[in-house]
């Protein structure tokens, strides 16, 4: 399995050049993309130009960063100067940002290579990537199934091998759930640990950029590159940068892992339940202490999340009016122009969420819905704080089900929203979460396990995930077409 850390060694030892590696991944991408369709745009020329610079640095004997020369890809709601940032929407189909997101600046400092921008649910609103207005991305394990969402392109690209790593964004599970569906690692950092400057907003108090990778070590390496305080983001957490690779220790002895009974109730797929119970047994054998915890207010998390997220989306997406940038539909007057632009530019799910968000913020409903949801959010955060005073981590399924067929939930928004039931609490509480592969279903679809930690507890999270990965190599999953020939 091609990983960042293994390929870095090959580059440093001159077993392969950065140009050869980049060309190999581009060639592999050409084979899998006709089926997977993870990408919305390509940047091969820029990638090869950077690869040449990396090779020149190696030839001179210069030290290179772990990400230097390793081909990755970026979710299409993260701004890269002079490259499209469509958010998979007709509204921004022709938008090209004049600046880089802060995470891109940091990746450039590491001589990263991006092969292009990745598909997603429109404006990150969805859990299957079916809401993209520009492409249909398939799950690399079964082309008839969804890759999850909203970072479906990111998870599908890494799983299929058309990128060694990727960036996604997570508002209510949009990194972790597709990682679970595609059998890869997806990390949502603590809110504020990674700058949101240059991330096109869905819900600003919930959004967080994070890595999608093939193993836990790679997740730590990408997090090293993108995390840390950024003066351009007012919600960025101050403090010294952390080397997360120091946390990759194969040891969970005496670690207290909480298992919340509320996440194992009705609606949990029996095969998912079995895989997670086996994961719990693995941790017991490794010396961790398993503790039952209770998060009773988590049953309100999904309702509170959708009220808060849609209210913020309604506000954030008000800027797309056909005046400043993005799509513009001609009309006789300003009001008609704005109305037609928004009607034709936004897809059905985005329109639904704007409508609901505007409703909960309207006079007479603000107190009944939005204010109440904010109070529930505080209760959920307090519950997590209390739980983490007793345990080091919390273990749950990432999603209640494995991937499903295209169209299966497209006409039932509530059924799709319920796929986020295990992931949204972490966003409401602002805590870090990671999804790692925990097995396969009888229909040969990946199952993900989620670990949650206290705010800025990524190191413990990564240690526990790494230890599980080392103990269960059977859970490191690569689809039949996912291996790159080097």
Where are the model-predicted features located?
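An N-terminal boundary/leader segment
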Residues: 1-52, 285-287, 477-486
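Serine-dependent amide/ester hydrolase catalytic core
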Residues: 8-9, 263, 298, 319-428, ...
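Short alpha-helical scaffolding segments that buttress acidic/His motifs in well-ordered protein cores
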Residues: 21-25, 304-305, 350-358
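Immediate post-signal peptide segment of exported/extracytoplasmic ligand-binding proteins
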Residues: 54-70, 248-260
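Residue-level signal for inorganic ion chemistry
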Residues: 25, 47, 100, 219, ...
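Structural helix-boundary/capping segments
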Residues: 31, 109, 160-165, 171-266, ...
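Short glycine/serine-rich loop/turn segments
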Residues: 67-209, 260-262, 311, 396-414
């Amino acid at each position: 399995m091609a990983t960042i850390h293994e390929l870095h060694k090959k580059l440093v030892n001159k077993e392969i050049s950065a140009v050869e590696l980049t060309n190999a991944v581009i060639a592999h991408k050409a084979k899998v993309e006709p089926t997977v369709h993870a990408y919305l745009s390509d940047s091969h020329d820029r990638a090869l130009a950077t690869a040449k610079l990396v090779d020149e640095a190696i030839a001179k004997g210069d030290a290179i960063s772990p990400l230097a020369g390793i081909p990755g890809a970026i979710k299409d709601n993260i701004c890269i100067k002079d490259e499209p940032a469509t958010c998979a929407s007709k509204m921004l189909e022709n938008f090209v940002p004049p600046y880089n997101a802060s995470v891109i600046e940091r990746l450039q400092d590491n001589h990263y290579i991006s092969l292009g921008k990745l598909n997603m649910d429109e404006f990150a609103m969805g859990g299957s990537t079916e809401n993209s207005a520009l492409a249909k991305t398939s799950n690399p394990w079964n082309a008839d199934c969804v890759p999850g969402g909203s970072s479906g392109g990111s998870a599908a690209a890494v799983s299929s091998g058309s990128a060694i790593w990727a960036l996604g964004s997570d508002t209510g599970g949009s990194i972790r759930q597709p990682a679970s569906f595609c059998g890869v690692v997806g990390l949502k950092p603590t809110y504020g640990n990674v700058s949101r400057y240059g991330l096109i907003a869905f819900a600003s108090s919930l959004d967080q950029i994070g890595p999608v990778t093939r193993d836990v070590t790679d997740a730590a390496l990408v997090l090293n590159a993108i995390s840390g305080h950024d003066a351009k983001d007012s919600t960025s957490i101050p403090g010294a940068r952390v080397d997360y690779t120091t946390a990759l220790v194969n040891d969970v002895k005496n670690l207290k892992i909480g298992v919340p009974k509320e996440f194992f109730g009705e609606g949990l797929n029996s095969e998912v339940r079995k895989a997670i119970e086996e994961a719990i047994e693995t941790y017991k054998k490794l010396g961790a202490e398993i503790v039952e915890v209770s998060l009773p207010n988590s049953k309100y998390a999904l309702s509170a999340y959708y009220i808060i997220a849609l209210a913020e989306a309604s506000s954030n997406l008000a800027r797309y009016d056909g005046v400043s940038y993005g799509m513009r539909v001609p009309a006789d007057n300003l009001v008609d122009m704005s109305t037609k632009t928004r009607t034709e530019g936004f897809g059905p799910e985005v329109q639904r969420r704007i409508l609901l968000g505007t409703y909960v913020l309207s006079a007479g409903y603000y107190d009944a819905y939005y204010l109440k949801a904010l109070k529930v959010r505080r209760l959920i955060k307090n519950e997590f704080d209390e739980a983490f005073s007793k345990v080091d981590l919390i273990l749950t399924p990432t999603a209640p089900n494995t991937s499903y067929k295209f169209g299966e939930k497209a006409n039932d928004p509530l059924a799709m929203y319920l796929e986020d039931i295990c992931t949204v609490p972490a966003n409401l509480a602002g805590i870090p979460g990671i999804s790692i592969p925990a097995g396969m279903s009888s229909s040969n679809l990946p199952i993900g396990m989620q670990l949650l930690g206290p705010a800025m507890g990524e190191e413990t999270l990564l240690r526990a995930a790494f230890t599980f990965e080392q103990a269960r190599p059977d859970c490191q999953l690569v689809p039949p077409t996912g291996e790159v020939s080097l």
